């Protein structure tokens, strides 16, 4: 250890400095010294001394965290004996010191949990030494309340620890441990926890006694952790709370068939203080969500009846629900009533009529108090949305009574939102309309609720809209109207326009009637009349929120009533014709385009409105029939002939705006490109006419670049806007004829300008990202649009430009030096990722014969590939998987390289080859299926190449192996562990995981086995021997069947046979292991 960390006193002083000092420099110095201490050889013994003799809680905390790091490390792990000693020491330490500082106790319990988890499969004398967890805590549970709290916390923390995957160990190992813990210990822990809770609820708990208080809290946490366990390894996304089913194992059935378990939590809810209730309700949420298949129909009905009774009791005594946490959890519980049970089952519950009345009243009251716990409203609306959606399908004879209650819920939502407007404006409160994501989520739910008893919904909306619209019109005509009154009516109309859009969007074709379509017509007429009024005032004033509501309405209207699938005889169109003279879809489309042009004219500097307006235009341009109708409109022809900043201000160069604000231009030109293509054909004059503004922009930038002094900001803005426009056009031009016009326009005239921009501004991603993205789009052979004539060299010329851009950018970006971690993606990795995508698109586009480059001494291909390697080696492995876009672009490029350019891969330096193989090895266990599948494909190509080269080297051939192949073989023979590790990983995933891409995994496996037959044999024996004696023969037979009829070659027929064998093998192994109490105790398989 370093000289300055000599004694315990010094260590304690460093801890004090680390946790207590306010001086940053002192803290950093202490942190550095303590990191050295953690990495020192005598750290373990010093930690024990700190725990034994340390005088401060901070030194005990340091010892516990250092020990946790030591037992967690994957390289140079601690021996088994040492870990057993640490585990026993920690238990004794906690037992003899029940009054430690809370954070020290917590850290020591974390240490125990980590040792137990990581050692779950460790054996000593045929005994799993870390599995006696209940025995470990029994002595705590039989002692004082403080000891009891420690014992319960140990179980709670252990359950939590085993449930959480960590990045330092493979996911396969985590799932294996979690499954074994679930099968061997979790139910006993849950039962123990429930029994202790029953004892606690049976006594008159003295909740003024803090220790009793703490015990109850820890028991509830433990129970919740048991119920929240990821039983089958599917909860990768914990942020989602929808359609959640708790996959309780069948062996737990008895606990849930016993009604006293459910009753326990409802009794606890009513008998303990409100501060504990949220945890009780969280447990009830999980219990209510147990999988349906755990019960038969009669059992489920009985369970549901008890559940509904408990909910009814809470609703009849709602005092505790005034606590926001209680209220939130109770709303979640209500939502689970419908997500896990069918309406047909609910209506058969004895108290259903009373309960649905209570829930409706509770919902209406909640909606009226809109300012209280707004995040909980989602769950209530979710319940009613699911109830309403089930009405057409319910077959039960019992009345569901939703025709009575859904209109009440709809009315409460609508009126409460309107009433909130005045209060929010008066008191300066946060406006829910500012959170468009939340508003949209609620409106999606309301769209289904509102369509139930739609006549009542429409009548209410018409009445409220007419009142607000009339008041609004009167205020606008009055000279004395206050701005506050105008703002209130605009706020109310904003909500109404949003809601009308939502209920129209909720139309379901098979359940709609002519009468309902006519009602939609009534609502649409009113919104369009309001639009005419507000548009006429835009020169003086406009309301951004109301405009966004209008765009939301137009988007819903487009989805339902415009397009190829809509019946034109709809009653809606008849109503539009009667009131507004809009006789058909073409006339309605002209209204859309008129609104789009108006918005772009008046709101060109308002990014939210501009981007949503352009998205609407883009969506309209996709439809086959609508785009053909649009082109005939004079307004669209105006856009095609006048797309300049003079008419559309957002196309201008605004020095105040951010460069990234120009993103919407790509959307605009994608739509214009589609519209232009409808009648373009081979008309080059029309094309050149359309491109005039872009030609002028390119000439302006070229002029600037030709002088030594130019306005850099203006040049950047002009160029960035231009390349964003061009990318939109390039994306839209997916036919050969139109794309060739674009290609011949940009090459060779303007390509040097793009290259010059990369040279000048490589360090500014706001400039390089749009340029690189344009190039990536130009080389993408979308819909086979890049088909050059046989006499044309354009394919090769295009690749030369691609190579030049990648090389220019790559070599310069590597000169940036150290980039801060929080900026590394924006400044460096994003551009590299686009370069990888660009190179992949060019290499896989099938419009270049890459063999000619070497033949004619052209270094374009070699330069691009060498730059790829330089860029790759500048990226840490962890970053490759941490940034999803980078992962996908890298692995898809690597797939193409291993498939078509394996000679290049084989020619790389040993450390580069090992880097690439390591990245494949890590990618095999990635959560992203695309990445994992790509890695399988890369590995298959490499293994196939290796196998072929090995086969050739053993045969007498007239053509010897190339120098690259020979070297590659030598490297692989020098480092067999990398390929062996991947064989182990692939086999592990296939046997133990929910393998979603089994076919992809099977392809490299045969090659891996044939290249490593001895290793595979050892691996197989290890797996077989780890099974209990009575299972070993069956497992041995599984492996025999896997290789049945497989020859020593990688021909397609042999591969297909192996893939079939592997499917059967996976089934048989899973069946064999289902009833096995043992796991696979193989270091190869587990590490």
Swiss-Prot record:
GO cellular component terms, semicolon-separated: cytoplasm; nuclear pore
Family: Belongs to the exportin family.
Function noted in UniProt: Mediates the nuclear export of proteins (cargos) with broad substrate specificity.
GO molecular function, one term: nuclear export signal receptor activity
GO biological process: protein export from nucleus
Species for this entry: Gallus gallus
InterPro entries: ARM-like, ARM-type_fold, Importin-beta_N, XPO4/7-like
Principal localisation: cytoplasm
Keywords annotated in UniProt: Cytoplasm, Nucleus, Protein transport, Transport
Record's subcellular location: Cytoplasm; Nucleus
Annotated protein name in UniProt: Exportin-7
Pfam families membership: IBN_N
Domain Importin N-terminal as annotated: residue spans: 30-96
